[in-house]
């Protein structure tokens, strides 16, 4: 049997209880395949499922039926320990906190699904419950084996997050300052899961077999990069030339032509110009 601790989120706990109720008492005859989605059906509010945290892609969001992956994961572990044939299993995008790396099995309607087959010679029965802060699943049947199973895992690769920068203006509405961490990075892993069989009588290791790879995603760290406030782009300009106090136009010098000798003829009836020798400029 397998037990995994659950949180005290009321909606999530209600979903766990509904899922366990649907599983409890299911019987598989030899050769039959169990489907988690077929057994539970679509998770809807009409069936009593509530909105609770669940992964959607890379984000943790509220979904109707959120949390039931803990039930499918606990069942997956029990199926491995019973040495049943795993038909279909998918790990989460990120490690979960209620079970070991490589031992989780995510489900969603319609896909992914979790399936296993009764590869024994006798019927098996699933018992599932929520009690004492734990999800409990055990698979009952006729034990023909002279060995018992233990599961283990190895983190074969680690993928460190990189740092990404997001640009903001100095007066950004979020109020970010330069260097503020917007999103913490998440380390990714490649996990290999193994099944070891030990002789019941002697405890001697009989075999150790590879079961599955589980690739958990890397999420880069995001840091705010805020522009420096800019200085005013215009400054008072200095006149290119000092203002002149001199007149813009130089006065014309008086003509040097000597006065005309008065004519001996009689004066004309038209009066001569008083300044006939000037150029006329001001």
Task: Name the predicted role of every residue range.
Residues 1-282:
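Well-ordered beta-sheet/strand-loop patches within structured domains
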